[in-house]
């Protein structure tokens, strides 16, 4: 599992909210990974924004972060239900931050994080300029993604060369070692 992490100024949350297509499929309410209600907060949402990477910053360890991000299902009891039930994850996580050094130091690698620097100055059109146009553009993006998916001509894993490039890129976003 990989989690894109966008770096930019205004518009980060709006981008992911619009990318979710319907506002109710987006949530930015994840503050702690050990919250008793964390799994209920995931249900019904397609994109979960970890604003300013707060949830990962509040985590006790990198292992807690990796375990949380890697789960494919949750088992918990909803109030008034008799027994816990398995619920498959149907969401992706997107971390946003204005900091450059947001990736945790992980001796096993940070394969769960894909930093995507965004320079709003280079954008031809800013996502906040016109929400209707932005939604139309994102609808087109999803239509093209669906065409690629239906063609079967895609890979869900990075090639070794791409993994090597990503690892080098991630170094630019690593937290400095504490002295």
Where would I find each of the regions flagged by the language model?
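P-loop NTPase catalytic core of nucleic-acid-dependent motor ATPases
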Residues: 1-44
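AAA+/SF3 P-loop NTPase mechanochemical coupling elements
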Residues: 38-43, 78-96
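Short glycine-/polar-rich loops that comprise or flank the Walker A/P-loop
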Residues: 44-46, 72, 89-92, 108-114
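Conserved AAA+/SF3 P-loop NTPase catalytic/coupling segment centered on the Walker-B
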Residues: 46-69, 103-109
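Structural recognition of the conserved hydrophobic beta-strand(s) that form the central parallel beta-sheet
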Residues: 48-51, 77-78, 90-98, 115-116
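Conserved catalytic/switch belt of AAA+ P-loop NTPases
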Residues: 62-85
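A short helix-turn-beta junction within AAA+ P-loop NTPase domains corresponding to the substrate/partner-engaging
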Residues: 103-124
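DNA transaction DNA-binding modules
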Residues: 156-179
């Amino acid at each position: 599992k990989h989690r894109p992490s966008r770096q930019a100024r205004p518009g980060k949350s709006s981008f992911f909210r619009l990318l979710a297509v319907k506002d109710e499929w987006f949530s930015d309410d994840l503050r702690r990974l050990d919250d008793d209600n964390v799994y209920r907060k995931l249900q019904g949402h397609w994109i979960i924004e970890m604003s300013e990477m707060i949830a990962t910053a509040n985590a006790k360890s990198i292992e807690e972060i990796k375990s949380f991000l890697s789960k494919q299902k949750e088992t918990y009891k909803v109030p008034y239900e008799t027994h816990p039930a398995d619920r498959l994850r149907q969401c992706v996580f997107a971390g946003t931050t204005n900091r450059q050094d947001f990736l945790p130091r992980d001796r096993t690698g940070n394969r769960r994080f894909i930093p995507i620097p965004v320079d709003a100055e280079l954008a031809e059109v800013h996502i906040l300029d016109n929400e209707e146009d932005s939604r139309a553009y994102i609808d087109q993006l999803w239509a093209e993604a669906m065409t690629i998916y239906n063609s079967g001509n895609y890979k869900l894993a990075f090639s070794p060369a791409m993994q090597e490039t990503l690892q080098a890129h991630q170094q630019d976003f690593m937290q400095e070692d504490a002295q």
